[in-house]
Swiss-Prot record:
Origin organism lineage: Bacteria, Bacillati, Cyanobacteriota, Cyanophyceae, Synechococcales
Family to which the UniProt record says this protein belongs: Belongs to the lyase 1 family. Argininosuccinate lyase subfamily.
Record field: catalytic activity: 2-(N(omega)-L-arginino)succinate = fumarate + L-arginine
A Pfam family this chain is assigned to: ASL_C2
Species assigned in the record: Prochlorococcus marinus (strain NATL2A)
Protein name per UniProt: Argininosuccinate lyase
GO molecular function terms listed in the Swiss-Prot or TrEMBL record: argininosuccinate lyase activity
UniProt superkingdom: Bacteria
Major enzyme class: lyase
GO biological process: arginine biosynthetic process via ornithine; L-arginine biosynthetic process
Length: 463
């Protein structure tokens, strides 16, 4: 069994770790993702130690140069931590001492891995939030360009997955742009709480060494510092919040994916999948499968699961730091990867992976009773109480269904038997384009309202 002295913390121990426990305990295989942030945090800490006179300026410079050398070696593929290094923090410290000698042992003055890892994770997540925001913008732009082309293209609108009222296709696509904007706003809000520095809180109680937390906070471009050291090292609210925001992103993508899957089916046939974003069957040569939206729909469960896992993990933890926190990294790393890849895949799908079948869409909005509400509105405009008009139109629809005809095919003489107020202009009101055009309330699908929204979104997204 290896000797305890091979570990940074092992002076307290007589025997080394069981090899299985050593591997079980180590996080280096995944927290190596934090290397850049660990180096950034350590450089800021070294500079602060020099400024405060805790170490000499020459020592601070040697520490910084050594850390930059590690960065270069990592970039060149020459930095290879092993399981016995335990985590990214010890791997860096060990390498630093190898490079610059005993002065490397001064780097950890006035800090603990507890505040160090919290700093690293916040720095890493801050970057990823900014990247995801740009991925959301790409999705918004992809949807917008399709919406702009399809202001006057109509698509059936549904409630309970039953035909309800016709919509401008642009209006439908803009709904998802609105969802993405809420996702962006949530991430922006989460970022505020990510962007607080725990560095200098040490293990849990602060330190007796005359460090300056404000200097390191400023060096790392944090907005401020935690005011309570216990809270600083034990807070993972920002992880839960990020996973919550990510879960909503995936929920929105899953809803959009479900619609694409339905639209691509023979039963709907609203879109045609291009070869760029579809695959075939190993058995059935006629198939073209919507793999991209199906995968995104399936991947949403991964992110939901990580959120639940984090909530379960933190709910029973006493203050302050606990080894349980090691589990936050794989959850957040995988969630970031899943969200980013899903956003990019769906953006590509709408950029080059589908074509709306306009003839089929026109057929769909022209062959149902989704204009029935407009018959009621027609009567309301003639001073018939809405509920009375609603009940009358319900009887008209029932009769039409029994006779196998659409409202547009009812002769005018028959209309007049239902109510004397029906005139020839009822046929114009029944046109799908007229139905959509009439929805001029704020936020409605009327062409005028949708055009206003398109102009507004073009200004937001492209200027």
């Amino acid at each position: 069994m290896e000797k305890a002295l091979s570990k940074t913390w092992s002076e307290r121990f007589d025997k080394g770790l069981n090899p299985f426990i050593e591997k079980f305990n180590a996080s280096i295989e995944f927290d190596i993702c934090l290397l850049e942030e660990d180096l950034d945090g350590s450089i800021a800490h070294a500079r602060m130690l020099g400024i405060q006179g805790i170490i000499t300026k020459e020592e601070a410079l040697r520490l910084e140069n050594g850390l930059q050398q590690i960065r270069k070696e990592a970039s060149d593929g020459l930095f290879h931590p092993v399981i016995s290094d335990e985590d990214v923090h010890f791997a860096v410290e060990k390498k630093l001492i190898d490079l610059i000698g005993p002065v490397g042992k001064k780097l950890h003055t006035g800090r603990s891995r507890n505040d160090q890892v919290g700093t690293d994770l916040r720095l890493w997540l801050r970057k990823r939030i900014d990247e995801i925001d740009m991925d959301l913008v790409r999705l918004q732009k992809s949807l917008f360009l399709l919406a702009e082309e399809n202001l006057y293209t109509l698509i059936p609108g549904y409630t309970h997955l039953q035909r309800a009222q016709p919509l401008s296709l642009a209006h439908h696509l803009l709904a998802y742009i609105e969802m993405a904007q809420r996702d962006r706003n949530r991430l922006k809000d989460v970022r505020k709480r990510v962007n607080i520095s725990p560095l200098g809180a040490a293990a849990l109680a602060g330190t007796s060494i005359s460090i300056s937390r404000k200097i390191t906070s400023s060096e790392l471009h944090f907005q401020g510092i935690y005011s309570n050291s216990l809270d600083a090292v034990s807070d993972r609210d920002f992880v839960v919040e990020f996973l919550g925001a990510s879960s909503l992103i995936m929920a929105h993508l899953s809803r959009l994916s479900e619609e694409v899957i339905l639209w691509a089916s023979e039963e709907f046939a609203f879109i045609q999948l291009t070869d760029r974003c579809a695959t075939g069957s190993s058995l059935m040569p006629q198939k073209k499968n919507p793999d991209v939206p199906e995968l995104v729909r399936g991947k949403s469960g991964r992110v939901f699961g990580h959120l639940q896992a984090m909530l379960t993990m933190i709910k029973g933890l006493p203050l302050a730091y606990n080894k349980d926190f090691q589990e936050d990294k794989e959850a957040i790393f995988d969630s970031v990867k899943t969200v980013k890849n899903s956003l990019i895949a769906i953006s590509i799908l709408f950029e080059e992976g589908l074509i709306f079948r306009k003839e089929r869409l026109n057929q769909a909005v022209s062959s149902d009773f989704s204009n029935a509400t407009d018959v009621a509105d027609y009567l309301v405009a003639k001073d018939i109480p809405f509920r009375e008009a609603y009940q009358l139109v319900g009887r008209i629809v029932k009769t039409s269904l029994e006779e196998g005809i659409l409202l547009k095919d009812i002769p005018l003489e028959r209309w007049k038997t239902f109510h004397k107020f029906f005139e020839k202009d009822i046929y114009e009101k029944l046109l799908p384009s007229s139905v959509v055009e009439s929805r001029l309330s704020a936020g409605g699908t009327g062409f005028e309202r949708v055009q206003e929204q398109l102009l507004s979104w073009r200004e937001k997204l492209f200027n």
